[in-house]
Amino acid sequence: MLPLLIICLLPAIEGKNCLRCWPELSALIDYDLQILWVTPGPPTELSQNRDHLEEETAKFFTQVHQAIKTLRDDKTVLLEEIYTHKNLFTERLNKISDGLKEKDIQSTLKVTSCADCRTHFLSCNDPTFCPARNRRTSLWAVSLSSALLLAIAGDVSFTGKGRRRQ
């Protein structure tokens, strides 16, 4: 914590300090201090995701319990009923998981430039943020160009230019 406070108090190189562009700094420091002082409670978003999982699990076990109560005597029907509830539970979890993945894919990241405090919202499709996508495109273009050049070179040697000299 002491190094963070020293960084905050010392001026940055060339008189520009990135921390002046960071309005959420006090909230983040407060959260870090809560973690250091072992104050209970996870972040709200994590607890909401956990609540979703616990709620779906509770529904599943309640349905299984009801099936056991009603179909206790017929074990084959009971196993089929439990298997059906298991499949429904899995489908609901997969649906929630797909929704979270889609939300994450479409999300943007807020990036602040220290030089002028301008805020940029970047996504993974942005070449500034994920340059690996552009490399794949350039690799594809280089491969295609090489294949075309080899095809042209091969075509020249087989078309008869070499035969005319003989």
UniProtKB/Swiss-Prot annotation:
One of its GO terms (cellular component) is membrane. The chain crosses the membrane at residues 138-154. It is a single-pass type I membrane protein. It is found in: Membrane. Keywords: Membrane, Signal, Transmembrane, Transmembrane helix. Disulfide bonds: none annotated. Residues 1-15 form the signal peptide. It comes from the Eukaryota. This is Testis-expressed protein 51. It comes from Homo sapiens (Human).
